[in-house]
């Protein structure tokens, strides 16, 4: 990772602390993974504080595949099976079946409908029957060990929510450029400056968890 581009945001610990502060304030953060992995940047929000306006930004500025990062416990509570029985995707991203709230939505596609689905899925008393399958929100199952077990955006998202003292559920989507290609670190930093969002890396979260 090009640390010189990240230098204005401080060191790894300072970058994580800035992200935790932003999340506690209901703001978004931008997380970039390793250059030798996906080398992509994701816009991440707390599922707990997510607003319709934030969802609209995710849909407008990102890939459109809005994912809900969940813990093992929540996946089991909702009885969400894996999307496929044999996951042979390059990075083992643990998609479950997609979901839709049964109540309070129309087609499920709008920003408001997707937020309703997410809030339904993370409610304390959520039940499997609260959700229809398939739908327009894509749950991801985070590994229990977080980024120390798998250096992915899914685990980084759940780790950040836990460290921020929020419900351990987050929403992510990959940032894309106008031409549809994926945004890399320089573009992610520019996006963060435009939207007043902190930028950090999966490597930063690993460093934070191993030193704090």
From Swiss-Prot:
Name the chain's protein. 3,4-dihydroxy-2-butanone 4-phosphate synthase
Listed pathway(s): Cofactor biosynthesis; riboflavin biosynthesis; 2-hydroxy-3-oxobutyl phosphate from D-ribulose 5-phosphate: step 1/1
Top-level taxon of origin: Bacteria
Q: Name one GO molecular function term.
A: magnesium ion binding
Q: Which Gene3D superfamilies match?
A: DHBP synthase
Q: What is its EC number?
A: 4.1.99.12
Q: What is one cellular component GO term in this UniProt entry?
A: cytosol
The gene that this protein is the product of is: ribB
């Amino acid at each position: 990772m090009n640390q010189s581009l990240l230098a204005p945001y401080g060191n790894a610990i300072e970058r994580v602390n800035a992200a935790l502060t932003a999340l506690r304030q209901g703001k978004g953060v931008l997380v970039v993974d390793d250059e030798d992995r996906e080398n992509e940047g994701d816009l991440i929000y707390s599922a707990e504080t997510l607003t319709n306006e934030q969802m609209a930004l995710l849909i407008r500025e990102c890939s459109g595949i809005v994912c809900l990062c969940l813990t093992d416990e929540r996946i089991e509570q909702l009885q969400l099976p894996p999307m496929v029985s044999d996951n042979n995707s390059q990075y083992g991203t643990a998609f479950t079946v997609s979901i839709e709230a049964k109540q309070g939505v129309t087609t499920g596609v709008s920003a408001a409908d997707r937020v309703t689905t997410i809030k339904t899925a993370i409610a304390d008393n959520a039940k499997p029957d609260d959700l229809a399958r398939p739908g327009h929100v894509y749950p991801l199952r985070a590994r229990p060990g977080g980024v120390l077990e798998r250096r992915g955006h899914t685990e980084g998202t759940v780790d950040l929510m836990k460290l921020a003292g929020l419900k351990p559920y987050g929403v992510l989507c990959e940032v894309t450029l106008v031409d549809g290609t994926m945004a890399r670190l320089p573009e992610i930093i520019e996006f963060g400056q435009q939207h007043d969002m902190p930028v950090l890396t999966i490597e930063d979260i690993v460093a934070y968890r191993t030193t704090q």
